[in-house]
Amino acid sequence: MSADVRDILDMERANTPEVTRDSFLATKKRNFERTKTASRRPEGMHREVFALLYTDKKDAPPLLPTDTALGIGAGYKETKARLGMKKVRKWEWAPFSNPARNDSAVFHHWKRVTDNSTDYPFAKFNKQLEVPSYTMTEYNAHLRNNINNWSKVQTDHLFDLARRFDLRFIVMADRWNRQQHGTKTVEELKERYYEVVALLAKAKNQTSEKKVFVYDVEHERRRKEQLEKLFKRTTQQVEEENMLINEMKKIEARKKERERKTQDLQKLISQADQQNEHASNTPSTRKYEKKLHKKKVHQQPRPSRVDSVVNAIEIGSSGIKFADLRGSGVSLRSQRMKLPANIGQRKVKALEQAIQEFKVDPAPPPTEDICTSFNELRSDMVLLCELRTALSTCVYEMESLKHQYEAACPGKTLNIPPSLVPIKTEALDNSTN
């Protein structure tokens, strides 16, 4: 069709293959290329893992590990046993002896004819400990006098067992001849053995070459007694011990909590001291100091951190720093009474309890004077709660010291001055809780 159109328009024909009978009848087979199916990455599989499983040819991963060193499809390097390729090696039934045995026993095993080694291959594992020996002269000079009255026959039997069983004292105690030498425990065998070793090393001047082991028999006996008592505990004793451990953990937790509260109080007092120093240079402070000086001319109070905190409260220092919204554009006056976000939940709860205790309106009308006074009041309430917590901590410490003193000194009672004991202890405890 396209050729006819080109003839009508006098256009050149395209180079098309000549139509023949064979091509028209399609007698020759056409070469159809197989469409390649692209393998898709399964869902949930990482791209790196998929790239390791599939090669560039997009072949599926093998079901079994193969070694293609001999070519594709060769499988493993040695897929079949190559029998008859080498000459058969000869074996013989040969005798051998174990050098670890002293009875000259002869055994047999199979070995190669070409193997000319005569040593037993497992003889290298025959490691023996060096047990010292002594002569009659050395025994009479150094080993005869001992606390537990060991005889030479008993000592010889002990060292014979030590050589036979390589210082396995449990086995040595089991093999001890009780009929001839009496009953000996494992601790007694160890004590006598290490005593003899130390005396021989001292007599032969070998203490500098190798450190001598010192065996504490009393410590070993106490250790075994404690282990035996621990093993024989009843179920009630185990439960009681677990209960005591849990109580000890609770006491430690309460102690850490008190220490943390003490540190917070110290920080609060230091902040009050700094604010007191900063506020001491203001005109209002100077007037206040002049009034105090006129009223208390003859009184000279002792300076302390508590006084500095009280003075800071009277001057106007606050435990809560409220946001200053004067230069931040248009805002509601009630936003000035909003608590800052950096206050912890514990202080917020303590402040709410104090407001309920003193029956203060939690949301007063936000006038200018009420906002300032309400913020100062809440700041003083927070400081009051901190001081109450510190006071209860001090009371608890005094009571614990009193009990410790009475326990250490029976029959004596520690009298605490009434000035140090708060009057309303229950109210303090309720406020801190």
From Swiss-Prot:
Deletion phenotype: RNAi-mediated knockdown is larval or pupal lethal. RNAi-mediated knockdown in adults results in reduced expression of the antimicrobial peptide genes DptA and Dro in response to septic injury with Gram-negative bacteria E.coli. Adults infected with the Gram-positive bacteria M.luteus display increased expression of the antimicrobial peptide gene Drs.
UniProt keyword Protein transport, yes or no: no
Predominant location category: nucleus
One Pfam family, short name: SANT_DAMP1_like
Residue runs in coiled coils: 186-281
Keywords noted in UniProt: Activator, Chromatin regulator, Coiled coil, Cytoplasm, Immunity, Nucleus, Repressor, Transcription, Transcription regulation
Domain of life of the native organism: Eukaryota
Location relative to the cell: Nucleus; Cytoplasm
Region Required for nuclear localization, residue ranges: 1-204
Compositionally biased spans, kind Basic residues: 288-299
Composition bias, Polar residues: 268-285
Compositionally biased spans, kind Basic and acidic residues: 252-264
Record InterPro entries: DAMP1_SANT-like, DMAP1, Swc4/Dmap1
One GO CC annotation: nucleus
GO molecular function: transcription corepressor activity
Residue ranges occupied by any Myb-like domain in the UniProt entry: 148-197
Location of region: Disordered: 252-305
Listed GO biological process terms: DNA repair; DNA repair-dependent chromatin remodeling; immune system process; negative regulation of transcription by RNA polymerase II; positive regulation of antimicrobial peptide production; positive regulation of innate immune response
Gene3D superfamilies recorded: Homeodomain-like
Function recorded in the entry: Involved in transcription repression and activation. Required for larvae and pupal development, and for normal innate immune responses. Involved in modulating the activation of the immune deficiency pathway (Imd), acting either downstream of, or at the level of, the NF-kappa-B factor Rel. Possibly functions with akirin to regulate Rel, and its interaction with the Brahma complex protein Bap55 suggests that it may regulate the IMD pathway at the level of chromatin remodeling.
Subunit structure of this chain's protein: Interacts with Rel. Interacts with akirin and Bap55.
Protein name, as recorded: DNA methyltransferase 1-associated protein 1
Organism this protein belongs to: Drosophila melanogaster
Lineage: Eukaryota, Metazoa, Ecdysozoa, Arthropoda, Hexapoda
